[in-house]
C-alpha cells in the first residue's frame, strides 16, 4: 500500500471513529438520562440519517462542479467535532437543567449526520486511486478500516462512558475528529478530470441502472439496520435479555461490526465466484433470519450469536451496493453518483429508527414494551425478505 493510500486509510479510520464513539449507548442514554420517549429517541437516532439524506446529493454535485474533494472532507471532520463537543455539553448539563436536553441532543446528533454526509467525497477520494474495473475491490478494501474503526470506537466509547461518564466518551470522539482533520489537511487534493459538470450530466448519472440498483437495495438495508442493531437492539437487550448489563453496551455492536468488517474484505471475491445475484440476496436473508430470531434471543450468548449473523449479512451487502453505485460512472461524475446513492440510503437511516419507535409504542401494552419490540423485529424481517427478492431480480443475468 502506497504512503498516500495509507494516509487516506488512516483518515477513514479516524473519520468513522469520531462518528461511532457513542452510538453504542446513545439510544439508551437518551431514554434513561435525557428522559426521551421512544419516538423522541427514534428522532435523535434518525436525525443522523435525515441530515445525510438532505446534504449528500448537493455535496456530491458541489464536489464535482468545483472539482474539489479535500475541502469537503475537512468540513466533515469539523462537523463531527461540533456534534460530539455539543453532545458533551448536553451530558454536562444532564441532571442540572430542566427539560430541553433531548431536543439539544437531537440538534447535535444532526451535525454528526452532516459529518457523515462528507463520506460522499472521502469514499470517492479513495476510489480515485483505482481504475474503474477495480471499483468493487476498492470498496471491499475501504470497508475494513471503516468498520474496524467502528468496532474500536464503540468498545472504547462504551468503556469510557461506563468508567468516566458520557461526556468523556463524546470528548474522545472530538479528539479523533481533530486528529483526522490534521491528517487530511496535510494531503494534496486529487481533483477529477473531465468535462464540466452540468444538469444534463447529473440526469445521466441519476439514470444509471447500476446506481439505481445499488441505491434501492441500500435503502432497504438501512431501514432494517437502523431499526435494529443501530437503533433499538440495545434498548431491547437492556430490558429483556438475561445477563445483559451496561458493561455489554460496547460489546453488543462489536458482535455485528467485527464479522461485518471481516466478511466485507472477502465479499468482492465471493461475488466474482458466485455472482452478485447470489451473494446480495444471501446477505438480506441473513438479516431477515437475525430479525426473526431477536425476540427469542433472550440469553446473552444467543443475542451475541444473532448479532454475528446480522453482521455477516451486512458484510455481504454493503461493499457490493456501494460498488454498484459508481463502477460504471466516470471519475469526474462519481461525487454526484455517490451523493445520490448515499442520499437515498439516508432515507432508510432516518425512517428506520423513527418508524421503529412508532411501532414499538403502538404495539406495547403500557409499560410492557416486549410486544412492541417483537413487532418491530418482525417488520424488519419482512423488509429484509423484500430486499432479498429485489436483490435477486435486480442483479440476475438478463
Language model: regions and residue ranges:
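Hydrophobic core of transmembrane alpha-helices in multi-pass small-molecule transporters
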Residues: 13, 98-117, 302-316
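Cytoplasmic helix-loop-helix junction between adjacent transmembrane helices
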Residues: 108-145, 324
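A membrane-interface helix-boundary motif in multi-pass transporters
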Residues: 162-175, 358-383
